[in-house]
UniProtKB/Swiss-Prot annotation:
Keywords: Signal. This is Uncharacterized protein aq_2172. Pfam families: LptC (PF06835). Residues 1-17 form the signal peptide. It comes from Aquifex aeolicus (strain VF5). It comes from the Bacteria. The keyword Signal applies.
Amino acid sequence: MIRGFFLILLFLLLAFFSENYVRSLEKLKEEITVRSELKGVEIQLYGEKGLEWRIQGKTLTYADNQVVINEPVIRTQDYTITSEKLYMNKKTRKGRLEGNVEIRGPNLYLRTTNAYIDLVKNISWGYNELILRKDTNVIKGRGFKIFFKPFKVQINEVESIHTTS
């Protein structure tokens, strides 16, 4: 009788410790995220017509389909986009540009704080204040959308337009 009681007690203790051990392993499994970091990177994205985008950066961090590129330089045709950081979803190829975003091209310069980019649809857009220089015009406004193929610029709210010679 006492022997049976001790066997039951031993079984319950083993079950208790086993359950705690399994729970601790599950917590470890949830906390582990595999991250990769590369330095001096270049990514080339191809579409139907060949090379469409070239992205260079100081460092690239990759975790859970999210790519973070520090000091990205993004090029398509004659246009170059720079910022402090690019956060991009690897699957959708959509991203967020943060910090000192600049878009340059033939007779075009746009500067804003943050913007978004869709590398599949070939567009970039933003909602913050901006300065746009196009030919001899300087436009201050808020919010924009740039279509790269074919090239077209839309400004949502124009605050002022200045013409320089």
